[in-house]
Amino acid sequence: MGLTAQPVLDTAPTTNKRLLDWVAEVAELTQPESIYWVDGSEAENTRLTDELVAAGTLTRLNPELFPNSFAGFSDPKDVARVEEQTFICSEKEHDAGFTNNWMEPAEMRTKLSGLFKGSMRGRTMYVIPFVMGHLDAKSPKFGVEITDSAYVVASMRIMARIGTEVLRKIEEPDAFFVPAIHSLGAPLEPGQADVPWPCNDEKWIVHFPESREIWSYGSGYGGNALLGKKCYALRIASVMAHDEGWLAEHMLILKLTSPEQKTYYMAAAFPSACGKTNLALLDPTIKGWKVETLGDDITWMNFDDEGALRAVNPEAGLFGVAPGTGWDTNPNAMRAIAKGNSIFTNVALTDDGGVWWEGMTTETPSHLTDWRGNSWTPDSAEPAAHPNSRFCTPIDQIDMLAPEYNEPDGVPLSAILFGGRRKTTIPLVTQSRDWTNGIFMGSTLSSETTAAAAGAVGVVRRDPMAMLPFIGYDAGDYLKHWVELSKQGDQEKLPKIFLVNWFRRTADGGFAWPGFGDNSRVVTWAIERIEGKADAVETPIGFVPTKESLDLDGLDISDEQLSAALNVDALEWAAEAESIDEWYRRFGGSLPEELLGELEGLKERLG
């Protein structure tokens, strides 16, 4: 038999009535064997990871290679975000919009109550107090995740600020927190043996925007189970941001220091697997410039009293796609990972107790144990690591972490980049004509689908601001919020907006631009545009660099490649304008008039 409400109230390390009532209610519903309040300590983490190793969920890695690090291997049916089972249950269907799945809230609550009834039987119910952003921010954003997964506790300890200190702050009168409940949906009957990766074939990731609640059932995988990440910091936070006058975005934050020692901050949005982490941890090939990072995935932005748009990273860790992250492509990420204290999921194991994935090293090991537990050699048909395998690493292990990461109020932005993955049409970099034109660029961002989301690979899909799977309300209202919000700021201080595409191909199918560290040449061109120093050609789509204005010193690139990278083809853009027209029609009446005006302007300029 599970617990009654009373023991929760007797032993809980909090007096917050709303929190106590909610924990008691969830315990009564889910019937766990015991309740544990997470304190976030080192001793607790050691005990939990020891238990996970004993259960077969985690494998302890060779401490000489990866100190205090572990690898986990999921059920093959639980490897990515499940967008088709992700719901925004707003009170009115219109408020969810066409980009989200919707169900009537009362109907969904009935369904969830049925699924969660007894779902934690035989398991420990962990209560994780956490904060997104800084504890000493003006308005800290608290959450409490209830979960029956110790793997989630260990991962949340890396990804957010958790435990006793947070709980102490939640004690303060009027402290608001987002309640987030997660269950693997794998109750254990007395005497029933557990499996290494419990989950359920039926999965539901549900958000109630008005009451700021998150319910997640059936999946133990990162984005579905670490509820502070996409569920809170983007889906629920985007609704809070709309209501409170700020922005919650799927963006990295960079700090750039020029040879003249002038500092600039830049945010950038990219859909999954378009090089976001590589740009966040950029190793510049351009002389005299220094690059530091403040974050690789999520950015919260608001206007300060002086009218500047400031950005903060609400996360405490990196949850990066492993394949393609390597010593030659992203040495900064690899150095952070090599320090240990990490949890890897669905990577391959080396024979000496380390981890490996495609793209990690130039040489492939002669033998591995693949993510499914099978013996693997370079002749094997399948990749050794799952394409969406992950590393979960503390952000403070990054050598190039900017000290401003610790500023509760964030940093003032000079520029915002939007980038997709397109073989044709979109040039290497385009500066928008103005702020609204920049929102137009962001609203039409497009990319070819990747392994990070379950579904078809290689289809071009529109991904406004790289937020398509993460907007917690109507997408047209979200774009309207971008248009309206700028009026709060000092128009002179608004960040300049640029559209980038590292993935343009030449006629023979090769990449037109080398990418990786050489993307610093594009980023510095953008900064020099802000300073009025770099030349550009005005095209129907915006301002594109002249060949001479890019610093190509030491770069091995042919004239043909550069021409292909910067080309604005009128025929391709005529087709693109039609495609955008089709995309915009999907918004119905909620698309801002300003963006329809931008599309008409583009068509006119294309003639």
UniProtKB/Swiss-Prot annotation:
Positions annotated to bind substrate: R81, Y221, G222, G223, S272, N388, S389, R390
Residues bound to Mn(2+): K230, H250, D297
Subcellular locations according to the entry: Cytoplasm
GO molecular function: GTP binding; manganese ion binding; phosphoenolpyruvate carboxykinase (GTP) activity
Residues annotated as catalytic: C274
One GO process term, biological-process aspect: response to lipid
Domain of life: Bacteria
EC numbers: 4.1.1.32
UniProt pathway: Carbohydrate biosynthesis; gluconeogenesis
Entry keywords, A to Z: Cytoplasm, Decarboxylase, Gluconeogenesis, GTP-binding, Lyase, Manganese, Metal-binding, Nucleotide-binding
InterPro entries: PEP_carboxykin_GTP_CS, PEP_carboxykinase_C, PEP_carboxykinase_GTP, PEP_carboxykinase_GTP_C, PEP_carboxykinase_GTP_N, PEP_carboxykinase_N
Disulfide cysteine pairs (residue numbers): none
GO cellular component: cytosol
Keyword RNA-binding: no
Catalytic activity line of the entry: oxaloacetate + GTP = phosphoenolpyruvate + GDP + CO2
Note describing how the cofactor binds: Binds 1 Mn(2+) ion per subunit.
Residues reported in the UniProt entry to bind GTP: A273, C274, G275, K276, T277, N278, R390, R421, F516, G517, D518, N519
NCBIfam families (UniProt xref): PRK04210.1 (NF003253)
Family: Belongs to the phosphoenolpyruvate carboxykinase [GTP] family.
Role played: Catalyzes the conversion of oxaloacetate (OAA) to phosphoenolpyruvate (PEP), the rate-limiting step in the metabolic pathway that produces glucose from lactate and other precursors derived from the citric acid cycle.
Subunit relationships: Monomer.
Protein name per UniProt: Phosphoenolpyruvate carboxykinase [GTP]
Source organism (scientific name): Renibacterium salmoninarum (strain ATCC 33209 / DSM 20767 / JCM 11484 / NBRC 15589 / NCIMB 2235)
